[in-house]
Amino acid sequence: MDQGAPAKPSEQKVPSLRTRWEILLLTLCLLHGSSMTPPHRRSHSRWLQAGSPQFRTHLYNVEAHTAPTPLCCWKNSLSGTNALRGPRLVTGNTGGAVTIHCHYAPSSVNRHQRKYWCRLGSPLWICHTVVSTNQYTHPDYRGRAALTDIPQSGLFVVRLLRLSLGDVGLYRCGIGDRNDMLFFSVNLTVSAGPSNTTYAAAPASGEPTTASPGAASSAGNGWTSGITQILEGSGSEWDRTVPTTGTSKTTSSANGRQTLRTARTMVPGTGSREEGSIRAAVPTPEGPSPKSRSMSSTTQGVWLWSTRNSVTPSVTTSEGRRQGTTPETDGPRDETDVRVSPEAPRKTTGTTRPSALISEHVTWETLQDKTEVSKQQMLHSLEELSPAPSAQTLNATCLEVASEEGRSIDGSLENTTEESSPPTPSQLSVAGPVWVSVKGPSMKSALMEGESHTRILTPVSTVLALLLIAALILLKRSLGRQRTSQKKERVPRITLIQMTHFLPDKLPDEGKNFQQSNLLPPQASLTVLENDPRP
């Protein structure tokens, strides 16, 4: 009998409630795990196409923080065992070929996974597959792109043939069914030969004389001054330049602003290091914010890194990437030109440094005058001297922090000298954002006012709580009294009716006569009238 009886509703609700609680706890656990896991930092590069018909391409590095997915345990373990590594920058010549080696952990899972080589394309920055192990090759790369997988060695090799300037871009070398699961970025640059033309002029009796590229004048360890002009041609700015030694100084005027450009190179054969610096005599601007862009050039196996700062009217930030327009405006322009001879391959660093007109002191006075940070330019300079046998190396670092319309540009600072001096206060200010702390009686008064408000609110809340409790107690007592009084009023009333039966023998004579006269005849019928209970 009990087995056939249906289950109670309460027993049916128990499994559903347990299931809901389990799902809720699992969700909270996953969310907690993903929030506690530190974000992974992945550095990649993007290409910014300038609006010129000569395809000038500028490469800038961006650091992106990618947070892990909620399935952190499985995803992190998978990425830890399947870490990819390989070259970050690959350079080739027009018509030549490049080979990229992508290494991965030789596990049983990775051996059977899909390997791919894809290219990021604008405007959505979707990575389009070029070639993969699924026997797929993009139509534009057929016959000149190949991918070979070597599972035993944990390596797959990508080879691109017949390179052209159109192949310059950002690529991905990865593993997985999708092109955004596990990968690392590779920058491919194609060199079309020397595209920078240099004109050098040496002074003779106070008048400049034009000299051909490559002409070097040396007088012991002396310096040679002249006028240097760099013309940008087609192709990317990862180009080769003709080695030239000398020093050039140029003073030009752009809307009343003077710019002094200096490029220095030691004479080869002295065993000394090269130095490159720029001293700009520019008043503190209040107009458009500056934007730094970097380029690199090479001279017959020696890579040179130079920094160029120019004024941009606006800087915009979009989803997933940072873009800016850098037109050649009338504003100040600083440029570093560092050249080295192929006979002395060594590290060469060229950076920019402001002059004494834009110094730390002026910047802090501007901040104390409560000038808006979005309309000023903070320049912090640092000079480091490293000893050398015959000459000294000057490494000037400069960080420009500016913003317009609430957006800011963060500059990264890298020191490539072999020896560095201890950090100075200006270097500490360059290393991170500037925080201005305000101390004084205003801060103390604000703190005292906040404490007094807290002290006042605490007793008021306590008194209100006590009053509420007392009111509830009184209300409960009054309700109890009303209920007891109503119960007392509802006491039942009993009415006793006593009926006495008189026998006919014991009736008096008058009563007998009255009874006989009132008796009905035996044939008569007694009719009882009933009252209608309805109104």
From Swiss-Prot:
PANTHER family the UniProt entry points to: HIGH AFFINITY IMMUNOGLOBULIN ALPHA AND IMMUNOGLOBULIN MU FC RECEPTOR (PTHR11860:SF49), POLYMERIC-IMMUNOGLOBULIN RECEPTOR (PTHR11860)
Gene: Fcamr
Keywords for the protein's UniProt record, in alphabetical order: Adaptive immunity, Cell membrane, Disulfide bond, Glycoprotein, Immunity, Immunoglobulin domain, Membrane, Receptor, Signal, Transmembrane, Transmembrane helix
GO molecular function terms noted in the UniProt entry: IgA binding; IgM binding; transmembrane signaling receptor activity
Tissue and organ expression note: Expressed in several tissues including thymus, spleen, liver, kidney, small and large intestine, testis and placenta. Expressed by oligodendrocytes, B-cells and macrophages but not granulocytes, T-cells or NK cells (at protein level).
Composition skew (Basic and acidic residues), residue ranges: 330-346
Organism field: Mus musculus
InterPro entries in the record: CD300_family_receptors, Ig-like_dom_sf, Ig-like_fold, Ig_sub, Ig_V-set
Record-annotated disulphide pairs: C102-C173
Annotated phenotype, changing L519A: Prevents receptor internalization
Domain Ig-like V-type: 95-189
Protein name per Swiss-Prot or TrEMBL: High affinity immunoglobulin alpha and immunoglobulin mu Fc receptor
Compositional bias annotation for Low complexity: 208-220, 241-253
GO terms (BP aspect): adaptive immune response; immune response
Carbohydrate-modified residues: N187
GO cellular component, one term: plasma membrane
